[in-house]
From Swiss-Prot:
UniProt cross-references to PROSITE patterns, sorted A to Z: MGS (PS51855)
Family in the record: Belongs to the PurH family.
Catalytic activity: (6R)-10-formyltetrahydrofolate + 5-amino-1-(5-phospho-beta-D-ribosyl)imidazole-4-carboxamide = 5-formamido-1-(5-phospho-D-ribosyl)imidazole-4-carboxamide + (6S)-5,6,7,8-tetrahydrofolate; IMP + H2O = 5-formamido-1-(5-phospho-D-ribosyl)imidazole-4-carboxamide
GO molecular function, one term: phosphoribosylaminoimidazolecarboxamide formyltransferase activity
The protein's name in its UniProt record: Bifunctional purine biosynthesis protein PurH
Ranges where the MGS-like domain occurs: 8-158
SUPFAM superfamilies named in the record: Cytidine deaminase-like, Methylglyoxal synthase-like
UniProt keyword annotations, A-Z: Hydrolase, Multifunctional enzyme, Purine biosynthesis, Transferase
GO biological process: 'de novo' IMP biosynthetic process
Organism for this UniProt entry: Rhizobium rhizogenes (strain K84 / ATCC BAA-868)
Length: 538
């Protein structure tokens, strides 16, 4: 049975007479304390916050003087006391509460300014287990929740950005706060503690390798509100979860306008793809449009990798996202600015490249500092009506797979390299996906078709168009390897690829008609390997 409310109406305005200040982030706290003191507000504080306020020459009472109980256990216990929580939770207009306060010597607290131990920062910095645990705040969330629950009478501030609005209210209304303000701050406070607890719970789940905990909460901090979402009629915002994975959420915007919803989605897809190509194996470039690659290539230099990626589908690349696995240099920047591009993302950018990109002030340039490790899984989430689908990120790499040759002819060394390249790209193409590749360059990409045969045909058409644009006599698919991100259910998909000129095929295998497909490959002297790993992408 639910707890029954006495339904005492909340007052519109409450006089702030006593404030409790206990913060880890001391940004603006001394200035706030001084302004409150000048308005006649009694200040209570704890630990380092008390020291900072007292050092500024302000009158402040240590909470231990109020509780008559010292701070103990390295600060783990200092505010968990009835005289603190009673002062925060007491309903001022309830006679029984007032009697209890009088009997136990509890003074009301009208303002709670609290922020928390930096658990997120310690986790992000890779702190060891004991240090991370020690930075789980207990007293802070308890006080925030207590004061926010009693927002009818108590104002709760958890963000230094709200200090100025509080002071404006107090100045405009003879030291009082409005119910609307208290309610808004309470909502913000509960959102803060919810996100904080979610990060802790998720950290424990990761540490214990629990993929499906009984309760899964994905918390985030608002990074920015956007003009609109995927379409102009949709509202949107970008939240960061604190996951320590290099990418669009950790990148620095060196120039250009605010990233849009679609920019962020596409840039994330681009950077995750290019991270599959380790820098020690050479420069690589991926060009993305609508979260699908339209060209991916490696090269002896970064500028050559970009040129080769662009050549795969220069028409679709217009207005796309460019992701690089190496430092963006001047030569590559000079080529990129020749084409309209929405976003460039790279681990680093040289000063010369920055100056060149600056010629296009609307071009968004992101520097990340590192590439994400493609072998680290992490979590991905997708909302459905009334639910949340959560899974480990697809961290299966073709380099780690046991490739099984299933045809009479084994692939040549070059075909095997082309197979791996194509399968690496196919992992990042919307299903059904078919990718042709040759000599470290995509030759044609077929994405998102309901029929795998149609994806193969589209990829072949793209290859023909690219060959014509490059002035080549035959399509890029001649002598190429072809990858399918899922098994070929019938021989028709294979025959379509063979007709386009492919001589080697890589696919997961596992169809009831595998033998039919293998027989067709043998009949045409095509080499085929099974990976045993599927890469569906929806």
């Amino acid at each position: 049975m639910a707890v029954v409310s006495k339904k005492i109406p909340a007052p519109d305005k409450v006089q702030v007479k006593t404030a409790l200040l206990s913060v880890f982030d001391k940004t603006g706290i001394v200035e706030l304390a001084r302004a409150l003191s000048e308005k006649g507000v009694r200040l209570l504080s704890t630990g380092g916050t008390h020291k900072a306020i007292a050092a500024a020459g302000l009158a402040v009472t240590d909470v231990s003087e109020v509780t008559a109980f010292p701070e103990i256990m390295d600060g783990r216990v200092k505010t968990l006391h009835p005289k603190v929580h009673g002062g925060l939770l007491a309903i001022r207009d309830d006679a029984e509460h007032q009697a209890a306060m009088k009997e136990h010597g509890i003074e009301g607290i009208d303002l709670a300014v609290i922020n928390l131990y930096p658990f997120e920062d310690v986790r992000k910095a890779g702190g060891d287990y004991p240090t991370t645990v020690e930075n789980i705040d207990i007293g802070g969330p308890a006080m925030i929740r207590a004061s926010a629950k009693n927002h009818a009478y108590v104002t709760t501030l958890t963000d230094p950005a709200d200090y100025s609005e509080l002071l404006e209210q107090l100045s405009a209304d003879a030291g009082q706060t409005t119910y609307d303000f208290r309610k808004r701050m309470a909502a913000k406070a509960f959102a803060r503690t919810a996100a904080y607890d979610a990060m802790i719970a998720n950290w424990f789940a990761e540490a214990l390798d629990i993929a499906t905990p009984r309760h899964r909460v994905i918390g985030g901090v608002l990074r920015e509100e956007m003009r609109y979402g995927e379409n102009p009629h949709q509202k949107a915002a970008f939240y960061v979860t604190g996951e320590n994975r290099p990418g669009v959420s950790t990148a620095t915007l060196l120039q250009g306008k605010q990233l849009s919803y679609n920019n962020i989605n596409d840039t994330d897809a681009a950077y995750e793809l290019v991270a599959e190509f380790l820098p020690e194996n050479g420069p690589a470039c991926a060009i993305i449009k609508h979260a699908n690659p339209c060209g991916v290539a490696t090269g002896p230099s970064l500028v050559e990798a970009y040129k080769r990626a662009l050549a795969c589908d220069s028409v679709s690349a217009f207005g796309g996202i460019i992701a690089l696995n190496s430092i963006l240099d001047a030569a590559t920047a000079e080529e990129i600015v020749k084409l309209f591009t929405e976003v460039i993302i790279a681990p680093e950018v040289t000063e010369e490249a920055k100056a060149i990109i600056a010629r296009k002030p609307n071009l968004r340039l992101l520097s990340v500092g590192a590439l994400p490790d493609p072998r680290v899984a992490g979590l991905t989430a997708k909302t459905v009506s009334g639910g949340l689908l959560v899974q480990n990120r697809d961290n299966a790499l073709v380099e780690d797979m046991e490739l099984k040759v299933v045809t009479k002819r084994a692939p040549t060394a070059q075909e095997l390299e082309d197979m791996k390249f194509a399968f690496r790209v196919a992992k990042h193409v919307k299903s059904n996906a078919v990718v042709y590749a040759k000599d470290g360059q995509t030759a044609g990409i077929g994405a998102g078709q309901m029929s795998r045969v149609d994806s193969a045909r589209i990829a072949a058409i793209k290859a023909e168009e690219a060959a014509k644009a490059m002035g080549l006599a035959e399509p890029l698919t001649r002598g190429s390897a072809v990858a399918s991100e899922a098994f070929l259910p019938f021989a028709d998909g294979l025959l379509s690829a063979i007709a386009a000129g492919a001589t080697a095929v890589i696919q997961p295998g596992g169809s009831m008609r595998d033998q039919e497909v293998i027989d067709a490959a043998n009949e045409h002297n095509v080499a085929m390997v099974f990976t045993g790993i599927r890469h569906f992408r929806h």
